Amino acid sequence: MPVSFLSLASQPQIIDYPAIKEEIDSIKKVAAGDPVSEYRAVSLVLKQTVLKGREVIAEALTRRPHQGRIAALSYAYLTDQIIQLALYAMVGDDEKATDNLVILAVGGYGRGEMALHSDVDIAFLSRRSPRKAQKKLIESLISLLWDVGLRVSQSHRSLSDMVKMAKKDITIRTALLESRYLVGDKALFEEASTRFIQKVVAGSGRDFVAAKLLEWDERHLARGDSRYLVEPHLKEGKGGLRDLQSLFWIAKYLYLEKEARHTVLTSPILTDYALVKADLIAGHEAKRFRRCENFLWAVRCHLHILVKRPEERLNFDVQRSLAEKMGYRSKSGKSAVERFMHHYFLVTKMVGNLAALFIDALKVNHYLKPKSRRSGASKQIDGFPVIQGEIVLDDDFFFRHNPAALITLFAVAYRHRLDIHPLTLRQAGRDARLIDEALQNNPVCNAAFLTLFTLPYNPAPILKIMNNTGVLGRFIPDFGRIVAQMQFDMYHHYTVDEHAIRALDILWQIENNKLEDLYPLGSRLFKQLNARLVLYMALFLHDIAKGREGSHSALGAEIALRLCPRFGLTAAETKLVAWLVKNHLLMSHTAFQRDLADAKTITDFANAVKSPERLRLLYLLTVADISAVGPHIWNSWKNQLLTSLYEACSQCLLEGPTGHGAGRQQRIENRQNDVSEKLDWDNDLFHALVKRLPDDYWFSERTDVIAANMQQIIDTDSKGQSISVRGHEMPAYDATMISLYAIDHPGFFYRISGAIHATGGNILDARIHTTRDGMAMDNLLVQNSQGGMIKSGEHLNRMMQAIEDAATSHIRSSNKLAALRPPLFWRGKAFHVEPLVFIDNQASDRFTVIEVNAQDRPALLHDLGCALFNARLTISSAHIATYGERAVDVFYVSDLFSHKITNQNRLKAIEKRLLAAADAARISEK
């Protein structure tokens, strides 16, 4: 009869063991000694049984989509029955066939936890080397199990080998820790269990704990040391299933060591029971363990069913479908997928809290080197008992007697550079519910909280601890709404709360010159600040309205106006914080999506900023905000653009709008003098070329770029050539500058961009100039498809040749570009960005500014350029910004007579063309 470790009402529906057994008996009779036909018939029956059982489990999960634990156990139960039936098909009821042989379920399968495509880990154990017949039986059984659709992973060891290998190899020891009897010699299993505990487990608890916690740290490091990565690894990521399993392994190991009379046989599934019995967590915490486990297993089971393969990563392309499968719906400004992932991150946060409590208990129980809670002399600091530099509460009702201490605890630790004992944090988390509206408005509590931003220490670590305990979200309910909240896009790598705290950490490092190489201007500006508190508070609050309907910047400013007086900021400070929150995207949008060489860009930005102090604050907030989005988001190109905008705006604020305009000609002359010194040419030659270049050119390019362009023009003209393409590496931008000098003609830009895209390049920025005698002098900043510099060599040469071909012979790149389809599993496919076109005739005095928001894809810029060409427009400059799956391409354009486009019908026609180009897989060249 089957061994059952699970009580399921749907067991007969999953698999009818007696009926299948009878069918196998019938097959044997019909086969009448024909082993081939018998094998085929049995394997077919078992395969159909597996498929039917899996369908039943999937249907049950669809009806009750959050019953993950039941689904995981059901898959294990089905697998048990199939293995036992397969063995029965081979040996019948002959117990001698498995004499001296036992089959064990090990690993996750042994624990009774499986998803649809989980490996089936089994171990064959014998007292001594098996007989020839048993070896053949093992081989045949494994073959049959594979044929019926089980992904079997197996090992075969003798009893003595099992003990030796378990002592040496922590992975084998962990797998055996979860051994569960399936079928065979039960006496052998009991003996093996006893020897495993007495010879391997006994006396090795400390070593096992240390090894597992080392694995824990290494795993988190490998997967990204944050539980809030927006494409998390369900199994191996921080706060995922492996973390829960690690807690269980340690608990079970220590429990077995402590209660050596118990064997693996007598406790086939311990889970939260083991955690409690090992005195590692309390009963109510074990319930949280169970809830987390149930949810994560539900996600894993749905994921395996959805993708039809063993997949553990919650990629963007499955998150939306998972949310639908698990019954989430859009609500209150949050999409269904954002609500699902919010729940996911809350669960991983809970796992992190459980882990912290668990590790603390290990210290208390001396399985890790503990900081004694009671050793050493105690002293009082601001009402808190402190032992050896650590706040250690000796009263379990401390916070209930004094709820305000829930806030002052963290302020005292921060001010006096004290640690907080894990058990004290545990109490704070438990009692966080005591924080009510009265406590939120308590002046003492708010003054204490404000010290986290006024003292010169890094506020990020203490805020992270407050957040992990739940105190921060209770004290500031608006912040509580963004805890574990994700944004369903490819740009933001972390949840909103994690992003805010990371941004504060980066800001503090900039202030303290720890990142001077990355942020040279930021480090200098901090020394000039008068409103440090305002900056830190604005950064803390800048995304606090994320996830609400409406502009999160405007709504966040309203929240800042309400919260800052409560915290103790003055009216002037509050007003400035609110302005920064409302405008926290202004500088990045201006720098990345507007032409910084256009005088009106600078004057409009300066009019919005109004003062040098505001400019400094906004620059520093912008830098920290961008850098905290995720790894590699901040780069030298963004640094250069923001620095250029800062310097230009600073100059404009210094001179005033009138002075800024009046000094334009003087700045042109200064730039020309700088270039002249760099080139050291004959004056007549230099000034002859200067006359050919338009005034805007001198504002658009840096001195070294202008010098290189002028040398390129002279070299080309002197050789009587009509075209020149040069490329040089720009390490400061992590990109390559392509400079093109050729006869200008309509459609020049889109053909050139097509050639770049067709040869594996992405354009970051394009400066498009036409000399007074009709030559194009264009500078394009280009990266490879991986977002890096295209280094000198075959790739760069091939790209420059393609550009030359496109410029001289009007070669169209449509055929090559048509082949640039996104990869089959392109992450951007999970998103839909509705294309939008904004046309602005106020942003520039000379050009119409067109902004296109669209889903990023290969050759998008080429398609948009083609649409503008077909609309008979001339592009003066193009500015390209990407935010994950979303591209924002901005063009400064004029008509063929160098005038703005003002006719409303024509503007509507242009918008229609661009929307079609942005939304189409490919557009045709007319």
Swiss-Prot record:
Record GO terms (molecular function): [protein-PII] uridylyltransferase activity; phosphoric diester hydrolase activity
Catalytic activity: [protein-PII]-L-tyrosine + UTP = [protein-PII]-uridylyl-L-tyrosine + diphosphate; [protein-PII]-uridylyl-L-tyrosine + H2O = [protein-PII]-L-tyrosine + UMP + H(+)
Cofactor(s) listed: Mg(2+)
Keyword vocabulary terms for this entry: Hydrolase, Magnesium, Multifunctional enzyme, Nucleotidyltransferase, Repeat, Transferase
Signal peptide: none
Segments forming domain HD: 496-618
UniProt keyword annotation of Lyase present: no
Gene Ontology BP annotations: regulation of nitrogen utilization
Region (Uridylyl-removing): 380-736
Keyword Ribonucleoprotein: no
InterPro entries: ACT-like_dom_sf, ACT_dom, HD/PDEase_dom, HD_domain, NT_sf, PII_UdlTrfase/GS_AdlTrfase, UTase/UR
Regulation of activity: Uridylyltransferase (UTase) activity is inhibited by glutamine, while glutamine activates uridylyl-removing (UR) activity.
Function: Modifies, by uridylylation and deuridylylation, the PII regulatory proteins (GlnB and homologs), in response to the nitrogen status of the cell that GlnD senses through the glutamine level. Under low glutamine levels, catalyzes the conversion of the PII proteins and UTP to PII-UMP and PPi, while under higher glutamine levels, GlnD hydrolyzes PII-UMP to PII and UMP (deuridylylation). Thus, controls uridylylation state and activity of the PII proteins, and plays an important role in the regulation of nitrogen assimilation and metabolism.
NCBIfam families reported in the protein's UniProt record: PRK05092.1 (NF003467), UTase_glnD (TIGR01693)
Protein name stated in the entry: Bifunctional uridylyltransferase/uridylyl-removing enzyme
